[in-house]
Amino acid sequence: ISTPLMVVTDGGSGFRKAMKDTWPQVRIQRCLFHVYLNITALTSKRPRLAPGRELKWLAHQLLAAKTPKDAWQWEQDYLAWEARWAGFLAEKSVYATGEYKDTHAKLVRARNLVRTLLRQGQLFTFLSPALLAASGLETLPSTNNRLEGGINAQIRRMWGWHRGMPFLHRVKAAY
């Protein structure tokens, strides 16, 4: 397989290791839909607290980012959210064991997820002018849903139809 310009991934750790071993210099674009799902899983679908509602809204806005200006605006909105709720996210609770832990642990995890992706430059790789020019395409993908909903879905559907098939037969049927 020739080296790609960019890889879109859902963020699985196995893929990250394979990328590091195989194509260490290739740019990574985290699937924005999967980032949205990750944040929604941590904030819940109907957050009760204002910081959770705002972060969920920001996650939804992430899917609408199509231009460098949109990406810049999203990042500014996120940084404003983080500054606005810094004190809230820093709150700690003392447990019976004497341990101090984050009071709003899931929101802190969601914040850390976004921080990491921004620091690593994996949220808006698909908008990189250099990659667009090198690819010769008008746009680069921001999600891997075309792959998951197209090619992989057909394989999963076939496996569903033949549930009793032994593992090796399923592997052979997929190829």
Positions of predicted regions on the chain:
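Electropositive, glycine- and tryptophan-enriched low-complexity nucleic-acid-binding patches
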Residues: 1-4
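Conserved beta-strand -> loop -> alpha-helix junction used to position metal-binding or nucleic-acid-contacting
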Residues: 6-13, 18-60
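Acidic/histidine-rich catalytic cores and adjacent linkers
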Residues: 13-16, 23, 53, 57-175
